[in-house]
Every structure is written in structure tokens, then in C-alpha cells.
Amino acid sequence: LVAPGQAVQIDKRVVVLFNGQQGDDLWQSGQDAMVQSKAVSLDDAQAAQRAYWDAYWHTSDICIEPKDESMAEAVAAEQQGIRFCSFQLAQTYNGGSMRHNIGAKGLTGEAYNGHAFWDTESCCLPFYLFTNPEAAKSLLLFRYNTLPMALERAKMLDCKGACYPIATLNGDEACPLWQHASLQLQPSTAVSYGIWHYVHLTDDKAFLYRYGAEMLLQIARFQATRVGFSEKIGKYGFFGVMGPDEFHMMVNNNAYTNYMGMRALRYAADVLDAMRADAPEAYAALCEKVELAPDEPAQWRHIADNMYIPEAPNHLFEQHDGFFELPHTDINSIPVSEFPLYDHWAYDRIYRTDMIKQPDVLMFLYLYNSSFDTETKRINYDFYQPRTIHESSLSPAIHSILAAELDKMDEAASFFGYATRLDLDNYNRNTREGLHITSIAMAWANIVYGFAGLRSDDTMLRFAPRLPERWKQLTFSVMYRGRVIAISMGADKTVFQLTQGDKLAVQVYGETVELTDEPISVQRQ
């Protein structure tokens, strides 16, 4: 019995374990882990936790300073928002398992049933590429480990190769809506893009030839059997699809789907050519394993070279065939009480206008940014931005990044504020269902790709820093091939310095700059 006024301390130990076991085996593993945990005291655990986060914030913190006192409160909210986002990403996934992916809600809620989407490769991967490259590799190895399921899924769609799922826990397609599960091809091309992005930034040829090439080959096979040839225009295209904009279904020649399919087909053929020259034994083994026909890579190139990309003479891409003919809806005329539209409009009504749920054309202009000139991006941004309703939480950050590139800094700052505080301020009134983890990843990209102007799809890293009006300074670091690049942005200049690793050539405002362990200052242009 406890006497009055007597204090009692109770130590509680909890073991959370997942190793694929079931029943008695899992129970015994838990008991063993509990015994092992007793060798660690609370003080030890706290010290290890503190050391982990100290190391993380040392290389991954993002600091924002206000221009003056009148802006301090607003900037403090943005500072809190971006640190919240960074913390949640690091907590959600650290690369410790190749059997798990990043669910749309991470570990914070039950919405989406824990499923991972193509957001992993298109939105989350850049964060890990520049803060924890091994974790980025583990995310791609999840896709390799689930390749057998993707092969089976393609067969269900009467195709060859690998069709990765739109929603999954373990590699199987888990989306119950056929119009999403069967018509959205972007998961497969996102995996191809993710492999390309990872290898492009790390030069990890061992991964590429051991794991990546097989995935790329099977994705290309799927694309080559899912594509169709139009006799009318004499070009290949994808028919009966749904692009990233889920407000339009069963469309033909979605620009994103066609463009990303073209890139996936071409990259697979390029990798096989390089592999045959650099690693002939691995190439021969792969060809035997997948029974590659000698003419397949050439056919992929032929399709890619003749892919229809719906582009108007003024460089405005038509989102899909007939999009320019759709009735226009003024987004500002829709009462706030009718949002979200999925809850208030008839399902088919959403499909009958030129209103867009999230970036579609702008999405591939963002992913392969260096392949398009500034004027093309400006024309498409000016056309599609007013038509986008942002019912996807990923949408604002993509627009902010492109707006910053186009020097539309007021728009960029406005979109950024939404992206960083989406869950903290419960903008979508659904934070109770869990955090928007993949949107949180885009908030990080909003800083690095948006205001710092980083582009990672060219022959070298490129920067074009542009600071929002109310900020005095922005500082952060990124990791790249064993280096840590510290960046301090001011209104008039940006200072670059390597705090780890050998010298590195980058481009800043189009000019080549050599980074060393000495600070180098570049004037704002």
C-alpha cells in the first residue's frame, strides 16, 4: 500500500515490433526484444534520442529571419511550419526498412488506410536525396521488392511488364476505384523517374545495374504494351487514362502521361545500352532473367521518338485531347461552402469543366524543369494556375516553386504559407485524419527548389536564389555526393560554403561557381 504523501515511480516499457512474423513467433520475438530493452536505461534512451536529433538539426535545419519587426510574427509562423514539416518527415521514415513505404498520412492517422502513392517518388524522394540518400535508396528498393506484384498487376490489365499500384501497403493494388487503379499510369513512370533522379544525383551504378535496370525494363515493357498508335496523327499516345488531375478521367493523350511515358521508355533503353558496355556480364544475366527480346529496346526508342505531346504553337501544352474545348468555370465564383467539391458536387459534374484538381502539365514542367525554357513555363503557368483548385494538398507547393522561378514572388510566398501550415492550422479541416505527409515533403521542396531555386535534373546542380519580401535571411544545408553545402540567402546576395567534402562546381544564376570550404558570395540577379 502507498502511504499518504508517499511518491511512487513506475517505469513503463513498451516494445513495438514488426518483422513479418505471426502468432507465437511474433510474441516470442517481442518478449526477446523486451528483455534486450532492459539493458537500456531511460537516461540512455533519452541521451540517444537527443544525440540523434542534434545531429539531424545540425545538417537539416532551415532558419528564416524576418526583414523587420513588423513581419516577425508572420515569419515566426513560417519558421515553425517548416521545422514542423522537417521533423515529421525525419520521424516518418529514416530508411531502416526496405519493406515499407511512406503512407500518405505517415504514422499519424488512419486515413487512406496507410497506403503509399506515387507521391513517394515524385514528392518525398527529393527530401531524402538531399538529407539522407540511403533512405532514398531504401524507398526505391521497396519498389524492387514489390516488383513481382507489379508484374501481376500488368497481366490483369492485359499488358506486359510492370504496372505499379496507385495505392499500396505491400505492393498489391489496394485502390478500390477502377478509374484510378486502372487509368492512372503515373505510379510506374514515377518509379522510373525516381530511379533516374537517384542515380543522377548519387551516381550509384551498382544500384542501377543490380536493381534499377530490371525495374526500368519492366516499366518500359508495360508502357510499350499500354500505348496506342493513332492512325490519324501518325503518333503514339496513351488512350483512356487519368493524369495527375483527377478531375478528368478516361481522356486521351494526357500530356503528363505521354511525356513521362516517353521519358521512361527512352531512359530504359539508354540504361540497357550503358549496361551492355559497362557491365556486360550483369547485362547478359538480366537479359536472360527477363527474356529480353533483341528488338525490344529499339521499339521503346521508336515509340518514345514518335510520342505525341499535345503542344500548341505558342508552347502551351494541352492537358489532354479536347481540354481547350471544355466549358470554363471561374473558381472564384464557387461558394466556399461547396468545398471540397468531392463532398458537394455530383461526381460526373466535376469532369465537365476545365477546372483542375492539382498540377498536371505543370507537374512535368517541375519534374523535368531543365528541359523547358522559361517562357514555356511562364505561358503554361499563366494558363493553368487560375484553373487549379488545389484540392490536392500537394498542389500549392508545386505552384509556389514555379512562381518563384518566374519571379512571381507574392504568389510564391502565398502558396508557401499554405503548404507549410496546412496541418498546423488545419486549413483543409481534416487534420484529425492525420497529417499530409507527402505535402509536408513538398513544403521542404518549396524552400529548396522554390526560394533557393535548386534544380537537380541538369548536368550539375543549379541555384537561382530569390528571397520573399518579408524575409531578411534564409539558411539551410543540403547533402550531395558526400558533401554538405551550406547556403545562406539574403536579399542582395547568397553565400555558399562546403562544410564537408571536396570542392564542387555548381551553377548560380547560370554562371559556374566552384564551391570550397571557404565562403563564396554571389550577388542577386
Where are these regions (language model features)?
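Acidic/histidine-rich catalytic neighborhood
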Residues: F222-L292
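Well-ordered alpha-helical scaffold segments within catalytic/enzyme domains
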Residues: I62, P66, Q88-Q91, S122-P133, ...
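Carbohydrate-binding/catalytic loop surfaces
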Residues: G103-H115, D158-A181, K235-N254, D321, ...
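Structural helix-adjacent loops and short alpha-helical linkers that scaffold large soluble proteins
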Residues: I64-Q79, G95-S97, F130-L140, V199-E214, ...
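Acidic/polar, glycine-enriched structural segments that form the non-catalytic walls/loops
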Residues: L1-A111, A346-R349
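Helix-terminus loop motifs that line ligand-binding clefts
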Residues: Y93-T108, E134-Y193, V199, K205-R210, ...
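Non-catalytic C-terminal accessory modules of carbohydrate-active enzymes
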Residues: D373-Y381, Q385, S393, I398-Q525
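Active-site core of glycosidic bond-cleaving carbohydrate-active enzymes
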Residues: A116-N145, R210, D273, L286-R432, ...
